[in-house]
Design a protein with these regions (language model features):
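Histidine-rich, glycine-flanked metal-binding segment
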Residues: 1-19
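Short loop/helix-cap segments at secondary-structure boundaries that form the rim of catalytic
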Residues: 2-8, 151-157, 337-339
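Conserved beta-strand scaffold positions in the cores of enzyme catalytic domains, especially
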Residues: 8-12, 77-79, 345, 351
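Divalent-metal coordination cores built from histidine and acidic residues
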Residues: 13, 18, 22-25, 36-146, ...
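Acidic/histidine-rich helix-loop elements
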Residues: 29-33, 86-100, 166-177, 234-246
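Active-site microenvironment of metallo-dependent hydrolases
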Residues: 40-43, 262, 274-276, 284, ...
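Helix N-cap / loop-to-helix initiation motif
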Residues: 73, 125, 290-297
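Active-site neighborhoods of metal-dependent hydrolases
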Residues: 109-120, 124, 171-289, 362-388
Length: 388
């Protein structure tokens, strides 16, 4: 942007609250199923940067380029290719590796496609984890991570993509069977320069505490019918004492890490959870656990920008940074629940208004067949990495 250059359009947000564009630090681009709905939903919920933590490399390159070229309405995408695994894979988006030659071919392809992150998966042996991390640092200049805080931290990785998720090593668990984390885990995330992408699936229970969220046009119009059915079902179930206790236990871990100086980037693992909406449930969970509005918001703005090495350009509202902004019809610093009332976003200075995003999609008569779409939703989420 050249100094003194007149704007072609002025946006009056004087009666709104403007914050840095939100990040979702753990997503999986799934255009083959969601079409343009996934990227539009993210914008509609105020997300201007999405971090892919696994998917098909060529498809992600296409999405990233289409967004940058203005051909696809969506957040900027930090792309990761397929999950780098050992001799077997868990998902279609994984790549199996038995030899160093095979791994080097995959990494050469990663360089050609300009990956923004390198992720190893649960059957990857130590040498795969280390060589992938080294390649990411030395050749790509990007971060690397996995599900494993140990041996991930010992092998040079930068973060874990969950607090606890699927894994194959008995000694790699970050939490106990009852969801508790202890001093050793907190020390890894606070004193070793090792970071955490938090994905609080337990926050989904909070949907039942605010059932009006299910009537939002972003749910009834933008979401595909299987997600609309899931949200409506969950909204009709007030959170139980047991669910809130489990949620509180997880939030206590995050609070301890943040209090100790650790960096937490908030993610969702969408579309395993409702796209866009779940980020707000997770933010509400953090605020409910005692974080101030500003502290909670930093986990989806400044801190992910730092975790992924993009804080020179993103994460705060400062002159000279990229114009990624979320415009809110309310003041989340006095009423945090209004954060979800996204009026518009700017991604790289390009304006997307809520009314336009919703207006581009029509309703589907088949949405009323609730049981059919609930079954579709269950099948799509079957055998995922984490319990909802």
């Amino acid at each position: 942007h050249r100094a003194g250059r007149p704007a072609a359009r002025h946006v009056d947000a004087s009666d709104r609250t403007v914050i840095p564009g939100l990040w979702d630090a753990h997503t999986h681009p799934w255009q083959t199923t969601y079409g343009g709905r996934q990227t539009v939903l993210q914008l509609a919920y105020g997300i201007t940067t999405a971090v892919s933590l696994g998917g098909f490399a060529y498809e992600q390159a296409r999405i990233r380029e289409a967004v940058a070229a203005g051909e696809l309405a969506g957040p900027r995408l930090l792309a990761t290719g397929e999950l780098l695994d050992g001799p077997r894979v868990a998902y279609s988006m994984g790549r199996a590796h038995r030899t160093r030659e095979g791994l080097q071919r995959t990494l050469a392809r990663a360089e050609a496609l300009d990956w923004d992150f390198v992720k190893t998966y649960v059957r990857a042996p130590g040498w795969v984890m280390k060589e992938a991390a080294d390649f990411g640092h030395e050749r790509l200049g990007v971060r690397s991570g996995s599900h494993l805080c140990t041996p991930g931290v010992q092998l040079g990785q930068d973060l874990t993509t969950h607090l606890q998720a699927t894994q194959r090593l008995e000694f790699g668990h970050a939490t106990s069977a009852t969801g508790r984390a202890f001093q050793d885990v907190r020390e890894i995330y606070t004193s070793a320069g090792f970071h955490l992408v938090a994905t609080p699936f337990t926050a989904l229970a909070l949907l039942g505490a605010d059932p009006a969220l299910a009537d939002d046009p972003r749910v009834t119009v933008l979401m595909p019918p299987w997600d609309t059915a899931l949200v409506r079902e969950q909204a009709g179930q007030p959170p139980t004492a047991a669910q809130l206790a489990t949620l509180g236990k997880e939030m206590d871990v995050y609070r301890g890490i943040l209090a100790g100086g650790g960096l937490i980037a908030l993610g969702t693992d969408q579309p395993l959870v409702p796209v866009g909406l779940h980020l707000h449930l997770a933010l509400r969970a953090l605020h409910r656990a005692g974080l101030s509005p500003a502290e909670a918001l930093r986990t989806a703005t400044l801190l992910p920008a730092r975790v992924f090495g993009a804080d020179a350009d993103l994460g705060t509202l400062q002159e000279g940074k990229l114009a990624d902004l979320t415009v809110i019809d309310g003041d989340p610093f006095t009423d945090f629940a209004t954060l979800i009332r996204t009026a518009a976003v700017l991604r790289g200075g390009v304006l997307f208004e809520q009314s336009d995003l919703v207006g581009d999609f029509g309703t589907d008569a088949g949405r009323d067949v609730k049981e059919k779409w609930l079954e579709v939703s269950r099948r799509m989420r079957r055998e995922g990495c984490c319990d909802l």
